Amino acid sequence: MLLLTGATGSIGSRLLPRLLEDGREVRCLVREPRRLGERRVDVQIALGDLGEMSDPYLVRQALRGVDTVVHLAATIRDQPPRRIEELNGLATVRLLRAAERGGVKRFVFFSALDAHPAQRTRFFRAKWLAERAVASSPLQTSVFAPSIVYDRTDPWITLLRRFSFLPVLPVSGDGQAAFQPIWADDVARCVAAALRGELRPRYELAGPETLTYDQMSDLVSRIAGRPRPLVHLPLPLVRSGLIALRSVFGEAVFATWEEAELMEVPMLSRRGTADVQALGVEPRRMGDVLEEGT
């Protein structure tokens, strides 16, 4: 039995069908089973989310009979009263410790490229803390560290498309942070392939091209048929503006400062696409993927 968290996200929704095609029994830890769509009848359901990892009964039940955990679930914004640090860092440690006690053999954790303790963002620092715990576990563990992951309909791409209806395309900061964007489906194929064999301690997942945030923003607007000039907004203005908007609109706000700040952090792998290709996946270029969805 495999426990999958984050099954309704960009990566999880593409990984789940591949796990089932491989003949795996899957249990999904989800808050809203209906979001699994027609796949919900093919899996076992454990009701819960990252914020409930402190409930020992819930976690114990979710792990019952499980030999492999694939922990995809994460958040890049606070979910009051819980904060990014608890939802990404502490929740992972709680799940990991419960897996150790529950007889789980393999634990796969999704981190991010360039996560380390001196990073400017809370998200990356929380991911680094979780990585350290996973690496020191007695279980057979594996950390997948991708660059920025995208899909045709994910919130980030959708927001850029909406911005392209404006006369100009707003970009926070200088837009020069560099990424190696990788398609969610390519990531899912990598995980499925890795699970079929002996897991390596770490995989760095990067796409075939290096693009700045400016270049990605321009690419999305052009493919949407609405190329726009980019206007760079000073970070202090972005920060104060997004904090003010969140105080008014709460969780309905279109973006948070924490999310905007992530676009200032480069996510590059010195290995390039080597780890992806070693798993038998030829990663696709961002423009090719997005054009197929138009």
Regions found by a protein language model. Give the residues of each.
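SDR active-site strand-loop-helix element
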Residues: 5, 29, 69-73, 107-113, ...
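Substrate-positioning beta->alpha
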Residues: 94, 155-156, 173-195, 201-204
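Conserved glycine-rich Rossmann-like NAD(P)H-binding loop of the short-chain dehydrogenase/reductase
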Residues: 24-31
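Short alpha-helix in the Rossmann-fold core of NAD(P)-dependent oxidoreductases
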Residues: 85-89, 108, 127
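N-terminal Rossmann NAD(P)H-binding glycine-rich loop of SDR-like oxidoreductase domains
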Residues: 2-22
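Conserved beta-loop-beta element that borders a ligand/cofactor-binding pocket
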Residues: 111, 132-155, 159-162
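NAD(P)H-binding glycine-rich loop region in Rossmannoid oxidoreductase-like domains
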Residues: 34-94, 98-101, 113-117
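Mid/C-terminal beta-alpha module of Rossmann-like enzyme folds, strongest
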Residues: 190, 194-256, 266-294
